[in-house]
Amino acid sequence: MNSFLFSLACSLLVAIPAISAQDEDAGGAGDETSEGEDTTGSDETPSTGGGGDGGNEETITAGNEDCWSKRPGWKLPDNLLTKTEFTSVDECRKMCEESAVEPSCYILQINTETNECYRNNEGDVTWSSLQYDQPNVVQWHLHACSK
């Protein structure tokens, strides 16, 4: 019985990404949006691959020539983030894209009341700490993508 459950779980790990890829190829909206709102209210955990390590990530073609996706209401605890000096989303995104500092910058979290910008301080984010539906916070995720 255990080997059957293991086989079933492995099959799902292969089938689910393939189905998601078919949805994207067919013009499906997906869960993440660029510059727009999250259209599904999704609570799925994002991939832990860093945006700065393109060799370990699938290439994503962004629909609006942008390599960022927006997650309103997503919040990581302060101990997983480092505050930056930037106060605008554009400046913060540019800093992240051009950063050569380790770990690679691929998660930005913006406090929309204070306009404070935070970035991931670890290479692998602890997604189990992620909180959803939090007020006054927006996360931006940088993807390895082609324009």
Swiss-Prot record:
Residues 21-71 are annotated as: Disordered. It comes from the Eukaryota. Expressed by salivary glands. One of its GO terms (cellular component) is extracellular region. Residues 22-41 have a biased composition (Acidic residues). The keyword Signal applies. It is found in: Secreted. Disulfide bonds join C67-C145, C92-C117, C96-C105. CDD domains: PAN_APPLE. This is Leech anti-platelet protein.
